[in-house]
Each structure stands twice: as structure tokens, then as C-alpha cells.
Amino acid sequence: MPDSTTVLTPERLYASPSLSGPAPRGVKFSPDGKRVTFLKGRPDDQDRLDLWQFDVQTGIQSLLINSQLLQPHDAELSEAEKALRERKRIAGAKGIVDYSWGTADTILVPLGGDLYLVSLGEGEPQVRQLTDTDAFETDAKVSPKGRYASFVREGALYAIDLENGNETRLSPAAEPDKAISYGVAEFVAQEEMHRFTGYWWSPDDHYVAYTRVDESTVDIIPRF
């Protein structure tokens, strides 16, 4: 009988995929409570995540959004996005790594630095691209009432009216020369407190509270 044992090196113990097997990520209920959605790796590529659903009534699991439907090819990540994924411990993940429910039949998906609004219904999901910029849109959310999609771009907070598509900057513009940004979670919040957002909607969609981050007194230490 051939020897099927494998030597487990330290590199393999901490590499992807996990030896304990795949686990669902980003588990959420839909607003109407009829579905449980989660991110799941593909059988042929566990690092590439698609959005799946569990129908509460029937108990059936099915693929909801194929990541390649939104973006067939992987985009080059920005340095800020790479750092954020490291802090979230998803540095090796591809495809859909985050999403936000809007209404019971709409989902906001950030992918490749842009935002997509996916409408669910009979047949294939309908995709509407909300942004198409060279900059990365991060920390995307749908407002509590479902009227706006909000996000951070280049250190400033923005919102898109989903009815007419108008985009508005909600905060002052960032001042990179002074190391000042708005609506972002600074390094300590992300790394030590596991807080990855820097802004919060009021329940009625009328107000947004956001952080002003001043890192001008933080020393720059080269990372080797």
C-alpha cells in the first residue's frame, strides 16, 4: 500500500486552504429574513469567494452571485486595500470578500475597487455598476432605509443616491499632505479594536456621523 502521508511544514500549517476545511464567511440574514447569505470558496479554488444563499423555508443552498459575473478578471489591489485585507486576515482571498444587503432584493458588492448593485429576482441577477474610477471605493454600505450607497474614496466620505445615481461628497476632501482623512478607521482601530469603519448612518438616513483622522504626528517607520 503506497504511503499517503504528508509532511506538514510550518509554511503549510499556516497556508491556505486551512487544514480544518473551508468555513463560511460573512454570514448575514436578508432584510426580510427569508435567506441566510454567506461567502464560500469554490471547489477548484478555495480562495475565490462567491456569494451563496440558504433558503430558510426550503433548506436549500444555492449560488446567489458568481464573482466572475461582476468582474471576470482580478483587479490589482491598492496598497490601502492590501493593508485592510491583512488586518481582516483575508489577504489571500479573491472574488467577493464583502457585501451589504440593501432592500430584500438588492445587494451592494464592492469588487476590484468599484461598487456594484445587484438586483435579485427571477432568473439571473441584474447588475448595475455604481462607480468606475481609478481610485478604490472602500467600506461600502447601504443606508438603513436603502436609499443611498455610501463609501470612502481617497480619504473622503461619499454617498450615491440609488434613485437617480447622483454622487455627493459628504465630508471635506482629504488632505494627504497633512495626513488628514475622513470616514476611515485608523490603524489602531483596525488592528487592535477590530473596527473597520469610520462612519455611521442614522436610522432615518438623514444624518451620517464620521471620524476625522489626523495622523500628522505619527512617525513613519520603514517596513522591510
Where are the language model's segments positioned?
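Beta-propeller folds
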Residues: 1-224
